[in-house]
């Protein structure tokens, strides 16, 4: 490819031969009007192209309005360029492309070279891993050898560990049972104290005869006793008060609700004044303070 241009003077015609000196074609991309004398009037200039017997109008130029014009014209055979200007030349320009065998071989060689360069660029862009130069990073911790025999597990040590675990479980079970018994005793004493506190104002009302209806005062007390205590028969002995556990007293441990509660193994305690029986000393003391003024 090379630059091409031609000047068509006033009153002349220029013949264009794309095949001279070698096979090629001409691409006309622009045409412009040359300088003219000032005293000459502004006249329109018509551009012509003659191919064989056919004459084609390419466009019209004017010095003040359209001094140049863009074209997209390809000439591959003999042609003639002309114009109608009487005061200025017209310039045609573009480029010439060779189409001969030599040019084709040049283009093929250049394309092959471009392909080789592209392939080399792809190879260079990829990192090559060499087996000889590659180094494996060593781990910070030592790796045990494959051939080294593994140590046999000691059966005696395993048996000792199992026995220790069983003993820990037994101790934990005893602690839970002890804590549940303590919670049962506390709940018994609290329920008895609540019952005594409710009975005391009821009796005072009866003594002062402030309320004639005695059944109305005693009704809520018996209802509460029916809910909180359940009598149990034990071999001809007196009925024993069995308390319902209160799990909300201690947040850390919850008593076993399914486990039945038994009376105190030390025996029953009875009040000397009213002959009421209690399962522990704390309940008896609270009863004396509430019913008999601490006697």
Curated annotation (Swiss-Prot):
Classification via Pfam families: NPL (PF17800)
Polar residues composition-biased segments: 254-271
Keywords: Chromatin regulator, Hydrolase, Metal-binding, Nucleus, Phosphoprotein, Repressor, Transcription, Transcription regulation, Zinc, Zinc-finger
GO molecular-function terms, A-Z: hydrolase activity; zinc ion binding
Region (Disordered): 105-271
Subcellular location: Nucleus, Nucleolus
Zinc finger (C2H2-type): 269-292
Membrane-spanning parts: none
Highest taxon above the source species: Eukaryota
Compositional bias (Basic and acidic residues): 123-135, 200-213
Function: Mediates the deacetylation of lysine residues on the N-terminal part of the core histones (H2A, H2B, H3 and H4). Histone deacetylation gives a tag for epigenetic repression and plays an important role in transcriptional regulation, cell cycle progression and developmental events.
Family membership: Belongs to the histone deacetylase HD2 family.
Record's protein name: Histone deacetylase HDT1
């Amino acid at each position: 490819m090379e630059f091409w241009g031609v000047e068509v003077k006033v009153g002349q015609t220029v013949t264009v031969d794309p095949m001279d000196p070698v096979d090629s074609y001409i691409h006309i991309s622009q045409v412009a009007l040359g300088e003219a004398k000032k005293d000459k009037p502004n006249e329109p200039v018509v551009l012509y192209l003659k191919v064989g017997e056919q004459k084609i109008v390419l466009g019209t130029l004017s010095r003040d309005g359209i001094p140049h014009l863009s074209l997209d014209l390809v000439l591959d055979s003999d042609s003639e360029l002309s114009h109608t200007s009487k005061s200025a030349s017209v310039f045609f320009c573009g480029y010439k492309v060779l189409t001969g065998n030599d040019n084709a071989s040049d283009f093929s060689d250049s394309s092959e070279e471009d392909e080789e360069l592209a392939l080399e660029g792809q190879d260079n862009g990829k990192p090559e891993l060499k087996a000889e130069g590659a180094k494996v990073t060593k781990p910070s911790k030592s790796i045990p050898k494959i051939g080294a025999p593994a140590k046999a597990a000691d059966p005696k040590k395993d048996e000792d560990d199992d026995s220790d675990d069983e003993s820990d479980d037994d101790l934990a079970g005893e602690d839970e049972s002890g804590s549940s018994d303590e919670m049962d005793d506390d709940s018994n004493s609290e329920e008895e104290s609540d019952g005594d506190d409710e009975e005391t104002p009821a009796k005072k009302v009866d003594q002062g005869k402030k309320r004639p209806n005695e059944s109305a005062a005693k009704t809520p007390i018996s209802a509460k006793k029916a809910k909180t205590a359940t009598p149990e028969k034990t071999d001809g002995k007196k009925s024993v008060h069995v308390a319902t556990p209160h799990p909300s007293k201690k947040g850390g441990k919850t008593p076993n609700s399914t486990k039945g509660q038994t009376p105190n193994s030390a025996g029953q305690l009875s009040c000397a004044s009213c002959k009421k029986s209690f399962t522990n000393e704390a309940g008896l003391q609270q009863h004396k303070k509430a019913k008999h003024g601490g006697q």
